[in-house]
């Protein structure tokens, strides 16, 4: 279930991302920068913990966690959140909660690409990554 996600991925397309980060509450200037960045993502698993590293010319983030266990995360836009990542139906589902708000990040493999659907309230962004 985890194996298809493992490896390094690069962003190849992004739809509605600016509206999504606006819904998160990201200010105008950082939001515009976020939309220009083409990050790469590396996902690894050591049998107990999973690591997700996201990198770009502007910022690098890394999270290390056990599936199904809540953990604290500082996001790329500096939000301090409680995250929970689980696997459901072949998808990796991440729920971030902070200050009474919640966003869901759903990662799935479709035709060899990683499709990431980010949802906040009624705003959905779809980002597609291909394996490097």
Curated annotation (Swiss-Prot):
Testis. It comes from the Eukaryota. Signal peptide: none annotated. InterPro entries: Calycin (IPR012674), Fatty_acid-bd (IPR000463), ILBP (IPR031259), Lipocln_cytosolic_FA-bd_dom (IPR000566). Its main location: cytoplasm. The modification Phosphoserine is found at residues 13-14, 40, 42, 44, 91. Belongs to the calycin superfamily. Fatty-acid binding protein (FABP) family. This is Fatty acid-binding protein 9.
């Amino acid at each position: 279930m985890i194996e298809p996600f493992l490896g390094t991925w690069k962003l190849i397309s992004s739809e509605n991302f600016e509206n999504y980060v606006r819904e998160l509450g990201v200010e105008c200037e950082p939001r515009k920068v976020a939309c220009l960045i083409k990050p790469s993502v590396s996902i690894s698993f050591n049998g107990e913990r999973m690591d997700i590293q996201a990198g770009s010319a502007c910022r690098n983030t890394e999270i290390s966690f056990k599936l199904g266990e809540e953990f604290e995360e500082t996001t790329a836009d500096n939000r301090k959140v409680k995250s929970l990542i689980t696997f459901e139906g072949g998808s990796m589902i991440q729920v971030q909660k902070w200050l009474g708000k919640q966003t869901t990040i759903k990662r799935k493999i479709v035709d060899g690409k990683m499709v990431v659907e980010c949802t906040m309230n009624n705003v959905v962004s779809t980002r597609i990554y291909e394996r490097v």
